[in-house]
Each structure stands twice: as structure tokens, then as C-alpha cells.
Amino acid sequence: MDNYEYIVASLPVLRPEDSRSDNVNAEALIAEIREQLSGRDQTVLDQLLAGYDDEQLTEDFYRQILRHKNRFLREWFRFDLDLRNATVGYLNHQLHRAPDHDKILLEEREVEEFPELEAAERILRGTDILQRERGLDELRWHKVDEITLLDYFDLETLLGYVAKLKIIDRWLQLDPDSGRALFRRMVEEIRTTYDNKKQNITI
């Protein structure tokens, strides 16, 4: 059995006080997490990471991932698909294209409410491109927190951290200051989460 508690506890001390962009390497942190997982869990992690390759984001990918046994993968990529479709839908409206142009619509998927739709559309209406990207990533960040809210020391917790590391990695490239700030934010969240959940378990 994987020692998820040990892995989670070790995350804050990997690079806890880094302040220079060349010292914050999200991909290296993900690789360190992966090395500590079992082969089965590595496969699940790889499926999460596949979702960051635009060439793999096909109907078949979403069809399979939305039926995955892992709860984090199912909920995360349901949100991801809805957010992508909302973004495409907004652009279609702005460009006077057909509403469903370039959307990924799964025929077998039941119509579901997208709770973040209003927030996403409000962000997309912004005129500052960087602020729009930051706003959408804030939605993603909060979704990770929502999905893993009741998780303790398990694979879902680690997948959530990796999803946040991917957000950090993107901002280290777009805006290094924002990337470093997000990294420090995640370190503090890990510390707080670990302390709180450890206390809850021992009570």
C-alpha cells in the first residue's frame, strides 16, 4: 500500500522557500511525486498528465476519462470539458460562428449543470488577456480544492497537487512573478492541509 501520508508530508520541504523562478521547477516536483507512487498509481497520474496535451483532448479521451474509476480524474475532466466548451462557446459568439463550432460534445453524456458557467463567462468578458487567463486558472485552482475537500492522505490529494503544479508551471512561463506567488501559495496550503488533516485523524 502506498504511503500517501509520507508523500504529502514531504511535499512542502521539496522547495519550500524558493523565490527565484529558476529554482521553481514544477515538472521536477511532479517527477519526484511520480517516483514515489506504485506502478498502478503512476498510470493514473499519467492519465491526468495526458490531459495537458492538447493533441490528446479528443472525444475518445473524454469519453474514457469520464468513466474512469478514479474520482478525481472523473470530476476534474468533467469540469475541464465544461470549461473548455464554455470558452469555445464564448469565442463562437464573439466571432459570430455556430454555437457548437469546435466544441467537444459527447452524445451519450447527460445534460448537466455547469456551476462555474456564470463565473467563467464573466471572466471571459474581460478585456485584459492576462487577467482572463489568471481568472480561468483561479477557477481551476478552486475546483481542485472542491474536489479534494474531504480527501486526506490518498491518491486524489496528490493528483490535486499535481493539477495545481501544472497551473504553476504555466504561470512560470507566462508571468514568472505570478508563478512564484502561486508556488508559495500552494506550499502554505500543503502545510495547513497536512496539519489540519493530521489533527483530525488523531482526534
Regions from the PLM with identified roles:
Residues M1-I203:
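Extended alpha-helical surfaces
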